[in-house]
């Protein structure tokens, strides 16, 4: 039995609240159960120095957790003077995942930065950041198109992510903190709306997992991501 009472293949309740803040070109509060992440997409009409005058744009991401997003207060990374390795790993994952959905030449010589700030953490913050970050990115690109700054939509399609794992010997979908902290295997999967994989990260924590368990986890992720993409589309169709 999962601590939340969910079935092995059941997602937490997912919600995307668009235009959550007023200044960013794209702004989304994404909720996966009790995990809440604010994703904002900001447009800069300059590219990184290494991309200047090359006719291509860039999408990057930054990730952070509020000090009391967890059970006990964490010191701000800014106060420590540097980002931790986990933070750098996660924001690179988010950036790679979102770039997989964008024709960077079609974006033109500009950069979109997607900031993912965890307000409350209950497992799956990186997967929520990718799923919410896509919606914020979509809105930022729509903003550019409405302003006439893009000739065509550079988005290939949707991108979403979810965690899967083995908890008490059973493959499960969308782990919360209680499950994640006790899982025998933890895996993060990123896919697009063409049902293709962008990234798979998996680690055996308790015991090595078998091929049949891997296939079960990937099947759970595939099904869950289809549902997340449907929720993204429903949010974006609200205009």
UniProtKB/Swiss-Prot annotation:
Gene that specifies this protein: rph
Superkingdom of this entry's organism? Bacteria
Name of the molecule in the record = Ribonuclease PH
Give me the residues that bind phosphate, please: 86, 124-126
Q: How does it assemble?
A: Homohexameric ring arranged as a trimer of dimers.
Keyword set includes Protease: no
Family, per entry:
Belongs to the RNase PH family.
Q: Which GO terms describe its molecular function?
A: 3'-5'-RNA exonuclease activity; tRNA binding; tRNA nucleotidyltransferase activity
Identify which top EC class this enzyme belongs to.
transferase
Q: What does this protein do?
A: Phosphorolytic 3'-5' exoribonuclease that plays an important role in tRNA 3'-end maturation. Removes nucleotide residues following the 3'-CCA terminus of tRNAs; can also add nucleotides to the ends of RNA molecules by using nucleoside diphosphates as substrates, but this may not be physiologically important. Probably plays a role in initiation of 16S rRNA degradation (leading to ribosome degradation) during starvation.
The species this protein belongs to is Thioalkalivibrio sulfidiphilus (strain HL-EbGR7)
NCBIfam families under this entry? RNasePH
């Amino acid at each position: 039995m999962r601590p939340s009472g969910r079935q092995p293949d059941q997602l937490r309740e997912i919600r995307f609240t668009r235009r959550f803040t007023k200044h960013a070109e794209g702004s989304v509060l994404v909720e996966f159960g009790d995990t809440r992440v604010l994703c904002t997409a900001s447009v800069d009409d300059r590219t990184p120095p290494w991309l200047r005058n090359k006719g291509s744009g860039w999408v990057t991401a930054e990730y952070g957790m509020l000090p009391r997003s967890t059970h006990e207060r964490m010191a701000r990374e800014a106060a420590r003077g540097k980002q931790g390795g986990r933070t750098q790993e996660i924001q690179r994952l988010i950036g790679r995942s979102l770039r997989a959905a964008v024709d960077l030449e079609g974006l033109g010589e500009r950069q979109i930065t997607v900031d993912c700030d965890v307000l409350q953490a209950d497992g799956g913050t990186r997967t929520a950041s990718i799923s919410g970050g896509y919606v914020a990115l979509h809105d930022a690109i729509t903003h550019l198109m409405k302003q006439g700054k893009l000739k065509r939509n550079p988005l290939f399609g949707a991108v979403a992510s979810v965690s899967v794992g083995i908890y008490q010997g059973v493959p499960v979908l969308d782990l919360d903190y209680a499950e994640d902290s006790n899982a025998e295997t933890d895996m993060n999967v990123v896919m697009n709306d063409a049902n293709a994989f962008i990234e798979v990260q998996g680690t055996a924590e308790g015991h090595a997992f078998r091929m049949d368990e891997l296939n079960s986890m990937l099947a759970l992720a595939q099904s869950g991501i289809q549902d997340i993409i449907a929720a993204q589309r429903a949010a974006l169709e609200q205009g």
